């Protein structure tokens, strides 16, 4: 899970990936009461925000509530999946939804995620450049802040000599060919690399497209920990806290 923090243990916690879901129960924390409810409802999937398992276990003996939950889940064939900091850090994730619910405007990430962006460079015949760009954008490339379809394009010439066994889009076997091409540069989240490459290979007319991937040190301002924003109208601290308690249906604050 590429957006989770290093300390986290999000993802599949208990169960088989090929299990067919009969129903899903959402919760903040996995407890025995949550598992009992899932069993009573006939649901075999529990999706929690906080992971049940954070540390490694050398034995499972039921000595604490976590081990009790592990044993109960396994005994009743319940799959447990947790989406924690990967959901917190996601663009438009948990923090953005809370900010929207409490009426914040001009919302932006408090601590942007680093080492999560990649630059893609590829070279495409001029006539097919637009089709390839569209395919890359559709696969998740080209988003910078509140802008999408971002790319940089330079015209130039590419050369190649097709060998026996190849099926060149242009040029002839055994002859050096020069083709007018466009160098396309764009950015993408690193976790979308596989689907972007698949889209590139599908849209590119060459049977052996040339492309480069470069890791970037730029922070991804759309993803990260926490958000900050402004209130539409000023409030005192007490007024704000009372409104938060009511809006989020909290018992304590």
Question: What are the language-model segments listed below?
Answer:
Residues 1-252:
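Hydrophobic structural segments
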């Amino acid at each position: 899970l590429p957006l989770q923090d290093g300390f986290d243990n999000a993802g599949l916690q208990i169960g088989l990936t090929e299990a067919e879901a009969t129903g899903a129960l959402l919760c903040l924390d996995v407890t025995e009461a949550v598992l009992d409810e899932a069993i009573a409802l006939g649901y075999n999937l529990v999706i929690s925000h906080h992971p049940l398992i954070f540390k490694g276990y050398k034995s499972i003996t039921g000595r604490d509530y976590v081990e009790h939950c592990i044993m109960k889940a396994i005994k009743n064939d319940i799959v447990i999946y947790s989406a924690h900091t990967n959901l917190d850090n996601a663009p438009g994730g948990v923090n953005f939804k809370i900010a929207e619910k409490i009426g914040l405007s001009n919302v932006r990430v408090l601590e942007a995620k680093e080492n999560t962006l990649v630059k893609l460079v590829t070279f495409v015949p001029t006539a097919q450049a637009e089709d390839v760009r569209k395919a890359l954008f559709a696969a998740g490339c080209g988003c910078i802040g509140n802008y999408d379809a971002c790319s940089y394009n330079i015209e130039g010439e590419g050369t190649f000599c097709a060998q026996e066994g190849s099926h060149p889009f242009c040029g002839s076997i055994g002859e050096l060919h020069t083709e007018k091409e466009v160098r396309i540069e764009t950015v993408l989240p690193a976790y979308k690399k596989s689907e972007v490459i698949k889209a590139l290979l599908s849209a590119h007319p060459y049977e052996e497209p040339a492309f480069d991937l470069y890791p970037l040190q730029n922070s991804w301002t759309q993803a990260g920990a926490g958000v900050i924003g402004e209130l539409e109208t000023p409030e005192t601290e007490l007024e704000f806290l009372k409104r938060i308690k009511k809006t989020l249906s909290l018992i304590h604050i």
